[in-house]
Amino acid sequence: MSPDPIRRKGRKTLAKVYDSLTDPEEAADRSRIIGLPTKKEARDIRDELTAAAWAAGKTVSRIQTAKEYISIAESFFRKLRAIKNTETRTPQTGIPSLRELLRDTRVTNLDERERMIETARADTAILLVGGKDLRGEGARILLILNETRLKMGKTTILLAHGTEKDHKAVLPAYKPKFYRR
């Protein structure tokens, strides 16, 4: 039984996203940026879409905001770099590979790695995105996450709140449909 239709200005957009979470034929358009609601509206929409995805029997990433994902990713790779730089390099061992570093207990015991993997593997990732998340390093991290998920055939929904100018930097490289209210 599907929940009540979403009643708000952007309901056509949200209905389309809801359909793509439940209907296999609608799943071709896997990634999208939804904008431009207020932050509070974006939170409400995220909760509705999360409930819709769960109702459709999909796993949903527990990371709730793009800012949180970006900080986890930055922290994780910062630690990887620090370990790589401090490792002793001998002619026999050479420079440690990424695979070796991922086995390192200083990295693999971190909750961040589990949460990054969970976000990459969940059927549906719904991230609340602020303007700062779509500029510079944050935009790059989100693009990499999206490309990884697209290759796996997974749905990524970025709920962008703020002003349209905040999204111009990421949109040309991004290529999903950009839904306006």
Feature annotation, model-predicted:
Residues 29-35, 93, 124, 155-157:
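Residue-level preference for the first positions of well-ordered beta-strands
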Residues 11-17, 45-47, 109, 142:
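Well-ordered, non-membrane alpha-helical segments in soluble/globular domains
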Residues 1-5, 82-98:
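Glycine- and charge-rich intrinsically disordered segments
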